[in-house]
Amino acid sequence: MLRLCVCISLIALLAGCGGGSSSAAPAPGTTVAVSGQITFDRVPAVAGQGLVYAQTVVQPARGVTVELLQSDSVIASTTTDATGNYSFGNVPASTDVSIRVRAEMLRVGTPSWSFRVVDNVNGEALYTLAGAVFNTGTANVTRNLHAASGWGGAAYTATRSAAPFAILDVAYDAVQLVLTAQPLTVFPALRFHWSPANVPVDGTAPGEIGSSQFKPSIGILLVGAADQDTDEYDRHVIAHELGHYLEYAFSRSDSIGGPHALSDQLDMRLAFGEAWGTAFAAMATGDAVYKDTFGAGQRQSFSVDVEQRPSRTNPNPGWFNEESLQSLLFDLYDHGRDVPPTTAPLIVDDLALGFGPIWQAFTTEQRTTRALTSVFPFVDALRVARPGDQPLIDNLTTSQRIAAVTDAYGTGQTNFGLPTKRTLLEVSQDFNTVYSSMAVGATLQNVCSLDDYTSALTGAENKLASRRFVRFTVTNPGQHTITVRARAPINAPADPDVVLHRGNEPRLVSEDAAAPSCAISTPTACVETFSPTLSVGEHVLELYEWTNTNALDDAEPPIGRTCFDVTVTRP
């Protein structure tokens, strides 16, 4: 996307549209002031229309670094204010200088942050916007710089200078929102990796990033391929990924990731994580309509109004559905009223917690819970912190077919979705609790890994009930033996795998291959055993039939319903 000025070794290559003027001369002396405004083109994303270049607006570049250069050396540096203005005082008079804007937001002290936009196909070079050299003369000077979109009317015909600053503008809004809840926040450094060469292709070649995404070890990757998929003006997409960054930096996510669609019945960890990103995007942008543009000329778009009650169009509302959860999260935050069609009961959202309580729950209970991250510990934290709001919170959860949340484990839930394979009655015999409970020294029978919630769009691997959760409490610390053994009948040789979760401590994984003796006729030989050292407290065991977490087109696709007996013993 932006082939604007990538800064390598402090050399700026991106030229900006600049304007200059001189004011009345200062009192006799040897210095003048240089000031101005930094702006960029923002192309609006419109639901149903994509990017509408005819409605491009000029926006101030807020909080970005501005440098004053003399002979390519930086002689002064400052930051633009909330209106994009900057100012340098005591600049040598009658001197040739230039202005350069770095695509970064930096602040030291408390609060602090470091956000940068770099070109991931050009050595991680920082994008910059460079103005022409001018002479300071003997009077105060105004020098404005503008980053243009590069759109030529039917295609991009010039450097896409505005893109990095449009990206940073979303980060600015996100930071300001967080600061309303936690004014002294220290944000970990983050890089946005954007390039016109970033294509929506999964591969190993430069720019083949697949899709816009947050990766903890890298930062945020954003597509920029014109006529395919560009995200620099998709404010919700950028803010969604910032939501994942905040989740990683200040909260916790146990999400297993993978493909997902709004109507899918997902693993609850994935459902909450994606819902959080989308709801945060609506909060940070102040726009409840999430928009993602793509296609030839960027004229196509996907959009969803997170303010609406999803059960109007969503066939699968519940604690496992990202559309339900994104609406719930936004309704907890906002002051809007959801008005379904006249054929549906009126749901009035009279709760407006604002961002402070949302952030508090997100960064405390959601981070430290011994349960897995999902809607349950989040809502439980809100209910505990705000007992007077419990009835209104419960109204919102029940409107999404989520029973009143009474703990972090989803105790008392009655909605287990709509299976896509077997009947609901059949599935309910195997799956009727969010977590199963067991005692150390006992055997929990018939914990079933299912593929009954497979999606026609996104497959089976991360869907509801493919992975099952068992909670148990350790009172005598030390080495324990965990055994998961298949039981008849099985459709194929089973391969149970186990993940042990200990809150925000590192998880333990046991994924041994099935023994040669494991067969349909000998299911008890299909076993996974490991012996971790456990501390006192609550633990969660995640278990699954390995193939039920594979894609439908995998060489070893899901074998479907596979049940296990589970034991945890202390020698």
Go through each PLM region and give its residues:
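Short, ordered, surface-exposed loop/turn motifs in non-cytosolic proteins
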Residues: 42-71, 94, 493-496
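Active-site recognition of the HExxH zinc-binding catalytic motif
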Residues: 236-252, 274-278, 282
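Short, acidic Ser/Thr/Gly-rich low-complexity loop/linker segments typical of extracellular
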Residues: 70-85, 511-512, 518-519
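C-terminal edge strands of extracellular/lumenal beta-sandwich accessory domains
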Residues: 429-438, 468-473, 499-510, 514, ...
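Zn2+-dependent metallopeptidase catalytic core
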Residues: 89, 111, 147-191
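Glycine-centered loop-to-beta-strand initiation motif
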Residues: 36, 66, 76-101, 468, ...
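Active-site scaffold of zinc-dependent metalloenzymes
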Residues: 203-232, 242-249
